[in-house]
Amino acid sequence: MTTMAETQTWQTVLGEEKQEPYFQEILDFVKKERKAGKIIYPPQKDIFNALKLTPYEAVKVVILGQDPYHGPNQAHGLAFSVRPGVPAPPSLQNIFKELHADLGVSIPSHGFLEKWAKQGVLLLNAALTVEAGKPQSHANIGWHRFTDKVIESLNDHPEGIVFLLWGSYAQKKSQLITNLRHRILKAPHPSPLSAARGFLGCRHFSKANQLLHEMGRGEIDWALDEKVS
């Protein structure tokens, strides 16, 4: 017997949304901006990496970000993650500090979080593109409608998911998560401006694993390999 989770994919839950005029307008806007010579992050091929690397049926944990990193070579389509060889930005450094304090895992020399994504951690930004050097420059081009739909589709997921909502922006999305099978953990944002107000010490990584264990879903190995293949 196949379960609903096995029969559903991002394509089946988001296919109709991608046919909506607004979605094509987003893609057209980004294309025109690039054509006009503006630098847009992440590269075109990486925009939907979060959905490519973490299949719908495999999602166990969701970490929400606001928009992609806006510096050179940083963003590659996974919230908070940076490409191999790029120094971890301050928020990610604080994530690693908390991970070390919580689970004792060593702080990696890189900030490439693909290993998490491949285990079922959806690293989703609310806006999927940004203009170089201009944070939140694409916050109002329609991405939020699409990524809200992603969250709503996860609310309908047949298995329990742990949502890690860091900062007031991410926490507003909790109104989209109404299904009682899911669990929500909230903390301040890991940015240097707010990490000391409760992100550091939140122990969300061990708590997420405990909740996954209780739901019979299998825990996440949060430790990152020292070498990135």
UniProtKB/Swiss-Prot annotation:
Q: Which Pfam families match?
A: UDG
Q: Which UniProt keywords apply?
A: Cytoplasm, DNA damage, DNA repair, Hydrolase
UniProt xrefs under InterPro entries = UDG_fam1, Ura-DNA_Glyclase_AS, Uracil-DNA_glycosylase-like, Uracil-DNA_glycosylase-like_sf
Q: Which reaction does it catalyse?
A: Hydrolyzes single-stranded DNA or mismatched double-stranded DNA and polynucleotides, releasing free uracil
* Gene3D superfamilies tied to this protein: Uracil-DNA glycosylase-like domain
Q: Name one GO cellular component term.
A: cytoplasm
> Which residues catalyse the reaction?
D67
In the Enzyme Commission scheme, what number(s) does this protein have? 3.2.2.27
Please verify whether the record's keywords include Cytoplasm.
Answer: yes
| Family, as annotated | Belongs to the uracil-DNA glycosylase (UDG) superfamily. UNG family.
Q: Return the HAMAP family for the record.
A: UDG (MF_00148)
Q: What is this protein called?
A: Uracil-DNA glycosylase
Its source organism is: Coxiella burnetii (strain CbuK_Q154)
| Organism classification | Bacteria, Pseudomonadati, Pseudomonadota, Gammaproteobacteria, Legionellales
Q: Which gene encodes it?
A: ung
